[in-house]
Amino acid sequence: LDPVHGMWFALFCERRGLRFPSLRFVICSYEFVSVVHRRILARVFGVPVFNLYGSTETGHLLMENEAGEMKTSHETALLEMLDTDADGVGTLLTTTLSNDFMPLLRYRIGDLAQRNEQPYGTDYIVHGRIRDALTATDGRRVTTWQVDQCFTDVAGVAHYQLRPNADGQFRLRYIPDSGGPDERNLKPAVMGLEALLKTEVATESVPTLLPEASGKFRLTSP
């Protein structure tokens, strides 16, 4: 399920009182799974929401487990990290194992990720597209995942996009959910974003945000 289009469907079902009693879980894929979309899907359908990460050319690469950890699919690919920064975030490379007709060797999938090596295994955090990363005023790279974490405890947002203004500051445009967040509820997200970006962030409530030509939505856009 595409998380953004799935969120719109969930809100439609909520307004119409539609229920799916046989539904056991929701698997999201195709684009970045935001905490705001996940919150709405879980609220409306009342089931766990899992993230399946991959691409058309590689197949599935990572699957979220019940603990919220993104685990590697060892049967389909090997994953490597390249050019990691001080936060451990770097370019994700994949070598496919399941496509005999078009194998990919150390393929740059175009995403940023972070590898966490644990005593019981390795998991990953997918940080979003490389081209969608922002730059803070102090020159640091700020990823889509880092931006999205600012909305973890902020209810009332259905969808958003953060992008820089011509003056170097940033503007957060968001679509309200169920009346939308008031200024007090939105303040923690704004404070978190300003701490990340080291500059002021203006906010604007909008009725809609358009997708790219591909049909995907950009939560962050440089």
PLM regions: where:
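Active-site glycine/GP-rich loop and adjacent strand/helix microenvironment
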Residues: 1-222
